[in-house]
Swiss-Prot record:
The chain crosses the membrane at residues 29-49, 54-74, 86-106, 114-134, 153-173, 177-197, 200-220, 221-241. This is ATP synthase subunit a. The keyword rRNA processing does not apply. GO terms for molecular function: proton-transporting ATP synthase activity, rotational mechanism. It is a multi-pass membrane protein. It is found in: Cell membrane. One of its GO terms (cellular component) is proton-transporting ATP synthase complex. Its main location: membrane. Key component of the proton channel; it plays a direct role in the translocation of protons across the membrane. InterPro entries: ATP_synth_F0_asu, ATP_synth_F0_asu_AS, ATP_synth_F0_asu_bact/mt, F0_ATP_A_sf. The lineage of its organism: Bacteria, Pseudomonadati, Pseudomonadota, Alphaproteobacteria, Rickettsiales. Keywords: ATP synthesis, Cell membrane, CF(0), Hydrogen ion transport, Ion transport, Membrane, Transmembrane, Transmembrane helix, Transport. It comes from Wolbachia pipientis wMel. Belongs to the ATPase A chain family. It comes from the Bacteria.
Amino acid sequence: MALNPLEQFKVYTIIELPRLFGYDVSFTNSSFFTMISVILMILFLLFGIKKGSVIPGYLQAAVEYVYDFVISIIENNTGSKGLQHIPLIFTVFIFILSCNLVGVLPYSFTVTSHVIVTFALSMVVFIYITIVGFKEREVEFLRILLPKGTPSWLAPIIIIIKLFAYLVRPVSLSIRLAANMIAGHTIIKVIAGFIVNMNIFFTPAPFLFIIALIGFEVFVAILQAYIFTILTCVYLSDAVK
């Protein structure tokens, strides 16, 4: 794997299952680490809120901090109207965060490095926001395609541009997340492979450098979950404001 840094993103079958309606539904390493990420996410939340103490322990404090953090993102971008959509946005944030952090572990698989996963997640958000927009604002929601004060002769061009920009939102969301996760993991793998091949891994400087890179990748994992969430809230603001 050190010689091929992209091998870590390869999907392979763990348990082969019969095809369903012509589609391969075998249990893969991607399926396994998605399941692990979801289980860890659920355990984190369940054990964090289990006691509900007035004076929280470390785990409860962590859950409350994450929850308050997501609340602040929603309020800053959508106002109080966006708070009713906490379940979706919080779930999106904690799921992406869990998948990203699991992907940092050695010999794991980064689920969010595959566009098919991030695009599916982006489409769920996109469809949800579109439904909310028409439900909350009805036909008024279409005004996002034509800013106020636009000259009538320019309106057709602006509408086409705005419509295209709206439709590519899930594409940009998915590619941004996947590309950043691929880039970060590839850089770490290339540098780590070089250090191992040079037989200098256990000398202080390279070892500390690898630790620093892993720490940076953890930061990127958290940052990408934050960026995906804040963009979701920005798009949601068009639907509720």
